[in-house]
Amino acid sequence: MEKIVLLLATVSLVKSDQICIGYHANNSTEQVDTIMEKNVTVTHAQDILERTHNGKLCDLNGVKPLILRDCSVAGWLLGNPMCDEFINVPEWSYIVEKASPANDLCYPGNFNDYEELKHLLSRINHFEKIQIIPKSSWSNHDASSGVSSACPYLGRSSFFRNVVWLIKKNSTYPTIKRSYNNTNQEDLLVLWGIHHPNDAAEQTKLYQNPTTYISVGTSTLNQRLVPEIATRPKVNGQSGRMEFFWTILKPNDAINFESNGNFIAPEYAYKIVKKGDSTIMKSELEYGNCNTKCQTPMGAINSSMPFHNIHPLTIGECPKYVKSNRLVLATGLRNTPQRERRRKKRGLFGAIAGFIEGGWQGMVDGWYGYHHSNEQGSGYAADQESTQKAIDGVTNKVNSIINKMNTQFEAVGREFNNLERRIENLNKKMEDGFLDVWTYNTELLVLMENERTLDFHDSNVKNLYDKVRLQLRDNAKELGNGCFEFYHKCDNECMESVKNGTYDYPQYSEEARLNREEISGVKLESMGTYQILSIYSTVASSLALAIMVAGLSLWMCSNGSLQCRICI
């Protein structure tokens, strides 16, 4: 009995000095996905997908957009009378056009290479409108009667402001030969057109000459147009049609016009005074009197996140577009508070845990650390070195992902005419395919980074445990739950030496050896006592059973219930 009491006293003495390795835990409910698991609760996580916008059109870095309201790009450039507010526009950051603007080509027809012109505008930030052929210079032609009820202004017939519809004068239409030399230092956007009458009567009524042509030439352009006279259904009250053309006239280049009828001459041209990143957005939004660094057709984005899922077409300093609904990066550890007894799935290294069943909510100044207990008390202490290394390792995680995904696929809002719908459909499928691949790669990268982060934390905890184990060696006992019981007295100074890696093993080895041997001896003597008692108990039980059997036999023989025969 004395031996058993000594054993209990010794065990309680050793348990009083103990050090444990653990990790931070908190009340977080944030969850992330990894390659191996879904919905892993972590102490800290960072959402890297922007889902919100303000629903407004804003200035981009202080520069207002050109919002065309009910006017199309064609209506603005040609000068639809209903678009007079855009006769002179200041510098713009981007252009906004509605999906189906009411004020387009008021006189029915089409704009040649319109989509290519829009693409050109996506690299321009400012036009300066200049007069190249004054309307008053057409002395041999009627430059005032070329108006139409299809282009009304203040209740009267009118026409596009930037071009002149030339009509015969005094029953004659002399052949036109005009040139304009671009003496500016900037490129010049020049517009002109041709009228296609409804019938021969309209042709001679307007131009006198039954057979006409228009020739246009520059150093890079050689064009000859003839009117196509045909009966057509009326559009905007007109059976005739107009076709408009454009070219970019380089500095010191000249454009030459020659025509004997059906000519819609340029009066104004656009000097391209500033080039830069721009775009034409299809949007029904109104101006919001706000400023942003990133604009989409759905609204402005003000975010520092690296990804967004709002719209593939953006302008400015924008996050990268993905089709994902959720992208969350793990920046902390698996969150398994100590009070939670349900076993969690283990990481690759099995540290958080495998042998450590829960985190410490009491340790708030670091990710990994120690809990000690001795005669002087107990407490938590973070391991600042390993924590700082871990913080350094995850601080730049978002930038690392951006660098790995540094090839942004740009969804360009291309437009195609009716003859190119098949190309448009193919282009859309290609863009959708690129975005699908881009999104998949992003999601996969996040899953891999999350797996790597959690395994990184697991590894750090295991490394800290091994650091203590290698110092203590046989001076302490591993308890299997992340804790060590000392075989010697370990005051606060001793505990601190374990934490900072300066533990003096030889200093405590003799005391530890004696206590370890004493505990082992008590266990062995106790085991011998238990063996003697066990043998005695077995013999006594067998003897008692034999006496009972013999007594029962004698009693049965005496009353005749049992016959006993002894043969010699």
UniProtKB/Swiss-Prot annotation:
Gene3D superfamilies: 3.90.20.10, 3.90.209.20, Hemagglutinin Chain A, Domain 2. It is a single-pass type I membrane protein. InterPro entries: Capsid_hemagglutn, Hemagglutn_HA1_a/b_dom_sf, Hemagglutn_influenz_A, Hemagglutn_influenz_A/B. Palmitoylated. In natural infection, inactive HA is matured into HA1 and HA2 outside the cell by one or more trypsin-like, arginine-specific endoprotease secreted by the bronchial epithelial cells. One identified protease that may be involved in this process is secreted in lungs by club cells. One of its GO terms (cellular component) is membrane. GO terms for biological process: clathrin-dependent endocytosis of virus by host cell; fusion of virus membrane with host endosome membrane; fusion of virus membrane with host plasma membrane; viral budding from plasma membrane; virion attachment to host cell. It is found in: Virion membrane; Host apical cell membrane. It holds the Pfam family Hemagglutinin. The keyword Chloroplast does not apply. The record marks R346, G347 as: Cleavage. Disulfide bonds join C20-C483, C58-C290, C71-C83, C106-C151, C294-C318, C490-C494. Glycans are attached at N26, N27, N39, N170, N181, N302, N500. Residues 1-16 form the signal peptide. One of its GO terms (molecular function) is host cell surface receptor binding. A lipid is attached at C557, C564, C567 (S-palmitoyl cysteine). Residues 17-531 are extracellular. It comes from the Viruses. Keywords: Clathrin- and caveolin-independent endocytosis of virus by host, Clathrin-mediated endocytosis of virus by host, Disulfide bond, Fusion of virus membrane with host endosomal membrane, Fusion of virus membrane with host membrane, Glycoprotein, Hemagglutinin, Host cell membrane, Host membrane, Host-virus interaction, Lipoprotein, Membrane, Palmitate, Signal, Transmembrane, Transmembrane helix, Viral attachment to host cell, Viral envelope protein, Viral penetration into host cytoplasm, Virion, Virus endocytosis by host, Virus entry into host cell. The keyword Lipoprotein applies. Residues 553-568 are cytoplasmic. The chain crosses the membrane at residues 532-552. Homotrimer of disulfide-linked HA1-HA2. Binds to sialic acid-containing receptors on the cell surface, bringing about the attachment of the virus particle to the cell. This attachment induces virion internalization either through clathrin-dependent endocytosis or through clathrin- and caveolin-independent pathway. Plays a major role in the determination of host range restriction and virulence. Class I viral fusion protein. Responsible for penetration of the virus into the cell cytoplasm by mediating the fusion of the membrane of the endocytosed virus particle with the endosomal membrane. Belongs to the influenza viruses hemagglutinin family. Major glycoprotein, comprises over 80% of the envelope proteins present in virus particle. The extent of infection into host organism is determined by HA. Influenza viruses bud from the apical surface of polarized epithelial cells (e.g. bronchial epithelial cells) into lumen of lungs and are therefore usually pneumotropic. The reason is that HA is cleaved by tryptase clara which is restricted to lungs. However, HAs of H5 and H7 pantropic avian viruses subtypes can be cleaved by furin and subtilisin-type enzymes, allowing the virus to grow in other organs than lungs. This is Hemagglutinin. It comes from Influenza A virus (strain A/Chicken/Hong Kong/220/1997 H5N1 genotype Gs/Gd). The lineage of its organism: Viruses, Riboviria, Orthornavirae, Negarnaviricota, Polyploviricotina. The gene is HA.
